[in-house]
Design a protein with these regions (language model features):
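Low-complexity, intrinsically disordered segments enriched in Ser/Thr together with acidic residues
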Residues: 3-9, 74-148, 174
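Enriched for extracellular/lumenal, surface-exposed ectodomains of secreted and cell-surface proteins
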Residues: 29, 135-139, 151-163
Length: 177
């Protein structure tokens, strides 16, 4: 498959310091939902991690291979007993969370950034391969190209702002002519 990176970025535009930042992301899968578990993200193929995530200084990454993350919200899963600090097969990871270590804060007027090493599949499953055929008739009339899309957004929260917030959505596309 094709290798690429997601860049997760949180900018604190205020002068307020935020502690206990937790960033939570489920990797795109066909039929996945947003971080609240309430709305389809409409991913049409699966994305996998290709290696360990290198967090910014002062943060620790935890991984899970649990499929439950696709049925439940960040609020339900972020503290569940499913997380480990390493895995033997990064392609099996379904979600990760990045947690601020004790004493680490997102300072005022600063940015948190981390690159997520991802990979599109070498071969699409049957359900994903059926989707371009469904789209073809729509695209033939408009003259546009057909593609499959994997959509990603991440959730985050802090001690000072404990309500889960969701990032903007980004996508990876596989075009078909």
């Amino acid at each position: 498959g094709t290798n690429f990176d997601y860049l997760l970025k949180i900018t604190n535009e205020t002068k307020t310091e935020y502690s206990d930042l937790v960033v939570y992301d489920t990797l795109p899968r066909s039929g996945d939902k947003n971080v609240f578990g309430t709305q389809d993200r409409s991913s049409e193929f699966d994305i996998h991690l290709r290696r360990v995530i290198t967090p910014p200084e002062g943060y620790t990454v935890f991984y899970t291979t649990s499929a439950e993350v696709y049925q439940k919200s960040m609020a339900d899963m972020v503290n569940a007993d499913i997380w480990m600090d390493s895995v033997s097969d990064y392609s099996a990871v379904t979600a990760f969370k990045i947690v601020a270590n004790e004493g680490t804060a997102l300072n005022g007027e600063s940015t948190f950034e981390v690159r997520i090493p991802a990979q599109a599949p070498n071969q699409l499953d049957d359900a994903s391969m059926a989707k371009p055929h469904e789209k073809t008739s729509q695209d033939q009339t408009s003259g546009t190209a057909t593609w499959l899309e994997a959509n990603n957004s991440f959730g985050f929260q802090t001690n000072e702002s404990p309500t889960v917030m969701e990032s903007n959505t980004v996508w990876a596309r596989i075009p078909f002519a």
